[in-house]
């Protein structure tokens, strides 16, 4: 009775992990014996002695990355770590696993006195920093299970593998295989490693209970009811328990509390086949990353060789136990091993002169002529601890930084003889970066930023020895061994997929026991065979549910059994009565299983390999160029088929194709159509050979094999089968690509398993993609490539010794013209077959056209071995390409290794600042590399080692790439390689950044999902957890930039936006006390990768303009995606959205012209300040128009366009681009080419009439547009490299075609100027844009608070009774006529206040009186307000009589207003209205002089007619005359503006055949045309005799047109060899000159 009770307690303790009593009893009864513990102890002692004598490559103690020190009792703080990695941060790799150190039964192994179950010392600091942990595991409050012994409830003690229960002698030691006495049990992280958390007595007690169960007579009872399905499930659960991350553990914990297991397994199915839906997929455990016998350098020669599973020779019944069948493998993937070797060389080859300087973030440098000019002076303020007051210097932009340091040291040191300038650095205040001493001041981006926005340049002088160097690499970092595989393991993964060595050993022990029983049986062979089949099925299921033909054939030799389909050929049962016959069957079956294990280990890169002697290694090599056989292989079957396919599809077939750079090498081949088959599992078996009509020696080295699985859908029941068969279309179910030549350039041979990607994902035949083992239930394709006695290797041919080069000008003019037309396409995507043929034929003439190399190489007819010498010599002799053009050679179209190596060589000249501009594209280009190691990878790693800014952004871009399932494996290795190259301090910094991002993401998600009324409280609570993060870590750099170092959060300045995504508005405390708080927006729910890409393109555009001497004054803010659906955005200070500016004039403010001008006037009251703001507005508005049009940015409303008080306009929120406009039914929401409205034109013109400033604006737009057009190839290259990034709106060539069409590279500059001018006119005249703004105003009214109505649009501040003084009397003195910004009247009001005898005078327009009254009506009932004068006037509303009448009415209104009830008369609106503005402070004695609305040109006194701007050129017997602008035309006699147009004749012209004219501009004295008028067929000699007559007329409808001015231009006086542009004076009759 007591025994039974104890047994029940034992099972109860183990049920916590979801393993039933029956399952665990069966597993233990068959696999475990107590005497294995003594053997394990003996093995461990020998293994420990071996490790002490020969340390492993990867040291768990040597890296010693300090963890965050935790004071005792701070478990709640440490619990915050849970979630970064998705696993328990208390896992101590330095502790012994149960397998390494078995418990001592005589001594308790409980915690030592004073020990804390949480780690106090240093763990591996690398443990956390790659994980997202967005599951919400970050918590600061202890839960009910967060007590000291809670960890002991998570799992039972581990179950070590036991020897066979049969009395069979062990195998003698074999050659090449360690003996059983020397086999050590490795520390596999996949198994339970909780000895440090489990008291020794409890472990001892449970093992003793196990002993009782096994030895108490229950063994036979248990054996009689063996359930192999249950065993498989139990082993799977054991494996999952040791490999799943913290999220699964939390889910399991919830399940235990609900009375169910952590995994929802089905009920007992004894005797039934293992169903696919009931078994978990194979899991990928953390590998055993170092050989226990030594590192890579001193390992024995045969230790890490691939070992083939050879058939077992004799005595299969004496096969070794499961744990002896497999040995630890350090690195089975040869490509990864070679990559690790390259990484070691790269780390050792980095020559660092001063390790201290590697911890600096250097300010980016982008030199340009403007910033280096001597004529540009800077006012710089330098602060220093040695000085009580700051120093102010005035120096040139071209002055170097060390010169400024020297000048400062003159004030801080009396004697400079012992002072080295190089020991000092200058740090911008508020940023954790440093200016580069040897570079000019003006070349630093920080200085350029300050100049652009008129910010004071404030620098701090610091000694290098006091600068924090926590990110610097050290000598120890370079000397420590590479931990690539360890870092790969730490990265976040889905469900682990590879079975562990212990679990597989346990399954093999079961198999061996059943085989022994089958061999020793005297009868009842079908039942014994069924148990063998069940054990084989369990092994195959654990090995990715793969059933090879050898296994199927071997099983067919067994008698029929219910576990599988009956074999086609029934065997005579009497044959198996002979023991030798049974041994032959078992021998074949064992060999087939070991072959499957070897295949599985090679495919999934497991941490072990079969310990069977023999290894296939080819010493003979045959060059592929001499191998003339056709490419052939056998498609056997697909494994792991979803059961739902059996009821949804039929007639499965596989389509195979060969491609190189996206181009198919031959027609695809298809297998026959097959149906489902059922052996051990469901399969689709073809077993068919595919033979391509392509010889191996004609295959390019980077040839990809693409296999696509198709099937026909089963017609629905009740439908006509014949009719449906005719209409059925095959559906693609999955695809996979694999290179035919591996990284050693050897042709693929042998059996391969390839995981299929779902057909819903992109099928990129143009690039390499790893097989899909990322998804645990992916369908697996088995292909058998032929094997041979030698390796077939692709050897790179040498280039030809000679390649002709010819001058482009030596071609015929017709050929030159055709080639130029082709080259103007700027991109290889739109080359036709005829274009390619012509380019390749004339390739030797194209050397002078450097940028055409990608087009020429894309036209190569073949990339086979025989064609490479000609291509390589062309590449070698090509003129050095600039880095912008070389980017085009990194596209998927060019997989050739030599081409990509040359491209990287040319890109190598990039500066660090330029590299950052193109880094996202280079990270995407890594997808197009065929192999893990490549010149591009080495280039990026080398640059990351030398610059922290590059390292920072490279890390976050690679981390984002982990989300790309097709390339996650590659990005895992690259990210691990980057972290290997980093120092310990930088790895810890990345760890903190990820931790902070996860905490913010959790908070943002909680605020977003909460009810609006509860959001503020949730935000405040969540910010406390962020404060705990900073209390624990001190400081952290923001992912936006490594220069932004913060030390805390400012809760009072944090809030959220009332939009759909509810982003957080956060304010961080700057570490630098001289800097301001850093304000950012954190978004959760929006994919910011598109915003990142758009801002990158705008930043590159801005740099192009600046380099060309045209600073468009663009506002570029930082934006970075820190994961899918979340990221950070920099907040621009002193900026407001157009919506908030416009609604200050009411909800219909979008239809008014003055809101923007009034807002800028309010914030820039001085005349000079306002003029500067308008100038900034003109430039930035022009830049925004060009950028948004070229990139096709849509969804433009007045809430994602912002304006700074300095006049700089910029766009935000780029959720739609490349023309993907939001639709209302079939109507596009964005109807105009870009946003350019009348209120923007009002600011530019200085009123509602066009002025010459508008000419400047149009010229700026056209000039900026043409400069971007010159770099069309750059933007096509950059966007083309991003086609595979996963952004939905940039996924195919149609999206790229939008940019191509917008840039119009085939147009001349003149045509492009005309084209963009028409776009400006179209946008300005669009009513849809204003209507869209108005609709958005209405939609946002629910988010507008009442405080938004308490300010006046023309007042920059709010004034009160207390601040201004009580008003005693007001009187409207007079009205005055004004001409700027519009013609009208202004009213002068005298304001008297108590306790003062001086009156103040204010000037207000009628519209401003009306705004005051409208906003008062929103606050008070109409009964408390005086009546306001009517705005409706019959006749002219701006006449003198109307103004006089309104003066009297307004005088009465304001008198009654100040005598209204106190709540009205004393409100802030009234006192703000009567408070003087800066414009009121001017002298009020005289009327202001009329001012022209044209701020840049005034008509000279006595001169009539104005001026016209023309551009005249002559080419190819054609005269081109571009009419650009006219300024200063006279008004008509009735005082109205004219409707001018231009008419020209080419005299002499008696027949009036040369008449040309422009369109009519309506109601303007300063029209813009930008129209090209062309005269064709005019010989150059005839041109000297001609005279151009130009007339400007005003169209008068039915009346005669009025002449406004004309000019005659003698063409012989112009040198038309070059284009002539200038202004010509208009008169009644005049001859014009420039």
Curated annotation (Swiss-Prot):
Q: Which CDD domains did the record assign?
A: C2A_PI3K_class_II, C2B_PI3K_class_II, PI3Ka_II, PI3Kc_C2_beta, PX_PI3K_C2_beta
| Keywords assigned | ATP-binding, Cell membrane, Cytoplasm, Endoplasmic reticulum, Kinase, Lipid metabolism, Membrane, Microsome, Nucleotide-binding, Nucleus, Transferase
Q: What class of enzyme is it?
A: transferase
Composition skew (Polar residues), residue ranges: 87-112
Residue numbers spanned by region Interaction with GRB2: 2-298
All copies of domain PIK helical, residue ranges: 805-981
A GO-annotated cellular component: nucleoplasm
Top-level lineage group: Eukaryota
The reaction(s) this protein catalyses: a 1,2-diacyl-sn-glycero-3-phospho-(1D-myo-inositol 4-phosphate) + ATP = a 1,2-diacyl-sn-glycero-3-phospho-(1D-myo-inositol-3,4-bisphosphate) + ADP + H(+); a 1,2-diacyl-sn-glycero-3-phospho-(1D-myo-inositol) + ATP = a 1,2-diacyl-sn-glycero-3-phospho-(1D-myo-inositol-3-phosphate) + ADP + H(+)
Q: Where is the composition biased (Low complexity)?
A: 176-187
Family, according to the entry, reads as follows: Belongs to the PI3/PI4-kinase family.
Q: What name does UniProt use for this protein?
A: Phosphatidylinositol 4-phosphate 3-kinase C2 domain-containing subunit beta
Origin species: Homo sapiens
Native organism taxonomy: Eukaryota, Metazoa, Chordata, Craniata, Vertebrata
Gene of origin?
PIK3C2B
